[in-house]
Each structure stands twice: as structure tokens, then as C-alpha cells.
């Protein structure tokens, strides 16, 4: 018996081969939950090279892995910049399983085009980061929250924030602002939903060893005459040197905390923002 037996978890941004969303899907499934995985259909140019080489098929591949664990999995393609698609995603998930017990708001905008000073930041880039990282999370919380209230069985909402939710950095205005918004949404919705026994918490990873495409990394690799894999390996090694525990996080490190916050053991925890960073930030 798993601690999430009988639960249904909806996870956004779940299609990456080395992503946090996939790690969450597999972790929650391993503990007994049935899963809904959602992601945006990307063009080949927007896929990490390792996914292309491996012929990875986004949420199709994740769904097969979940089913191999003996759990059911529903796949839903969703563009989080379109409000109607978010509402339809939630409606389909609830209609398929009859309920949603866990929401993991994991999706984020592809970083890189935002890595400029605030005076050079384009409004459309700012808008996209706010739309995907904050507005889409609000809408998913709104629609799933309504279903949880209607069913009357409580629920768990886990929002993927970042250490950038707690500390501003130069050339990160759009990302910082969108992730600071996640903390505000988490705290306010935790209070709104507490009377219904629905908890809302945030997870704040530091650097994580994922392969999600980063436009800045791609541009830097090209400028240095390196493959993206070579450049990223150097980034991972260098970043690990500044972490007290000696390495950056793996997606599974983040998924472990998500699974705890999704469980009955976390029933009295709400409105919190937990770091997963190996000791690089303490508040």
C-alpha cells in the first residue's frame, strides 16, 4: 500500500526527459497515485539535444513510464498561455478520474531571452514570463481548487517556485518577479483554501540538473564553440562547487519534497516555501 493510494495528481510541465515534472510524476505514481501529465507541444528546435537523440516523446514517454509502475496516466497537451486550455485541462482531468486530489504547478517559461538588464527587457518577454510562471499557476489553482471544494475531500497544491522567489539578481527581472509572485499566490491561496482542508505550499529549488532548454546556455555554447551538452556539463560542475553539500540538485531531490507535501503527513503544513538547494540559501 502506498501513501497516495486512491489519489489523483495533475502535474503541469511534465514532459521533460530530465525534468522535475517527470520526476514528480514517477515519484507520486510509485506511492500509489494515478497521474495526469500535461505539457506544451514544442518544436524540435526547442527541445534539448539529449531528448532529440533519445527520441523522447514528452508526456507520451512519461505516460508509458507511469503505466509501467502499474498506475493509470492521462496525457493532456496544454498551452498555458491560453486560459481556456487551462480550464479544459482541469475539466478533462476531473472528468476522466472523477476527482483531483493533488495539483503540482510545475511548468515554467523557457529562460534565456529574459537575461538582460531591466532597461533592455522587452515587454513581450516580461508578459510571457508572468503569464506562464504566475498567471497560469493562478488559473490552475483556481479551477482545481473549485473541484477540490466541490468534492469536499480536501487536497494538496504544490507550487514550483525557486530560490529566485526569495532573492533578486541582476538581469533576472522577469523571472524574479514571476517567481516572487508564486510565493504571494501560495500564501494567499493557502489562507483562502484552508477552511476546505486544502493545503498550498511552494518548493524553492536552487540549481537543478535538468535538460530543459535554456536559450542563454544555447547562445553561450555557440559563442564558445561548444556543444550544448559540453557547455551544460561545465555549468553543472561549476555550480556544484558553490553548494555546501557539494553538488546541485537532481530532479528527484525536488520530487521527494513534493511527494511529502502531497501526502497526508503534511496535512498541517500550508502557506510555506521550502528550499531544496543544498544549503545555498537559508531563508
Feature-to-residue mapping (PLM):
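Conserved mid-core segment of classical short-chain dehydrogenase/reductases
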Residues: 49-60, 87, 109-127, 146, ...
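Canonical Rossmann dinucleotide-binding motif of NAD(H)/NADP(H)-dependent dehydrogenases/reductases
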Residues: 2-38, 42
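Short, small/polar-rich loop/turn modules that mediate ligand/substrate recognition or access, typified
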Residues: 194, 199, 269-271
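Alpha-helical segment proximal to the catalytic Tyr-Lys
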Residues: 146, 191-192, 267
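Active-site helix of classical SDR
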Residues: 141, 178, 186
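Residue(s) in the substrate-gating loop at a strand-loop-helix junction
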Residues: 162
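Catalytic Tyr-X3-Lys loop
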Residues: 119-138, 158, 182
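Short C-terminal tail/terminal secondary-structure segment
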Residues: 115, 167, 241, 245-247, ...
Amino acid at each position: 500500500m502506498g501513501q497516495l493510494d486512491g489519489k489523483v495528481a495533475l502535474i503541469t510541465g511534465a514532459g521533460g526527459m530530465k525534468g522535475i515534472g517527470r520526476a514528480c510524476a514517477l515519484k507520486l505514481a510509485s506511492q500509489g497515485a494515478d497521474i495526469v501529465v500535461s505539457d506544451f507541444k514544442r518544436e524540435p528546435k526547442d527541445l534539448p539535444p539529449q531528448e532529440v537523440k533519445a527520441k523522447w516523446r514528452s508526456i507520451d514517454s512519461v505516460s508509458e513510464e507511469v503505466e509501467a509502475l502499474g498506475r493509470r496516466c492521462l496525457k493532456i497537451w496544454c498551452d498555458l498561455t491560453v486560459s481556456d486550455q487551462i480550464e479544459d485541462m482541469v475539466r478533462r482531468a476531473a472528468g476522466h478520474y472523477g476527482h483531483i486530489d493533488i495539483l503540482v504547478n510545475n511548468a515554467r517559461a523557457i529562460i534565456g531571452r529574459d537575461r538582460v538588464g531591466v532597461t533592455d527587457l522587452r515587454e513581450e518577454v516580461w508578459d510571457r514570463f508572468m503569464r506562464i510562471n504566475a498567471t497560469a499557476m493562478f488559473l490552475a489553482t483556481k479551477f482545481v481548487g473549485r473541484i477540490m471544494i466541490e468534492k469536499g475531500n480536501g487536497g494538496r497544491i504544490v507550487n514550483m517556485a525557486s530560490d529566485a522567489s526569495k532573492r533578486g539578481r541582476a538581469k533576472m527581472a522577469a523571472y524574479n518577479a514571476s517567481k516572487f509572485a508564486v510565493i504571494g499566490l501560495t500564501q494567499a491561496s493557502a489562507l483562502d483554501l484552508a477552511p476546505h482542508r486544502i493545503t498550498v505550499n511552494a518548493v524553492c529549488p536552487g540549481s537543478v540538473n535538468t535538460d530543459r532548454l535554456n536559450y542563454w546556455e544555447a547562445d553561450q555554447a555557440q559563442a564558445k564553440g561548444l556543444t550544448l551538452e559540453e557547455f551544460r556539463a561545465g555549468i553543472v560542475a561549476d555550480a556544484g562547487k558553490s553548494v555546501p553539500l557539494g553538488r546541485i540538485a537532481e530532479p528527484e531531490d525536488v520530487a521527494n519534497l513534493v511527494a511529502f507535501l502531497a501526502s497526508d503527513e503534511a496535512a498541517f503544513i500550508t502557506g510555506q516555501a521550502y528550499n531544496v538547494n543544498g544549503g545555498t540559501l537559508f531563508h
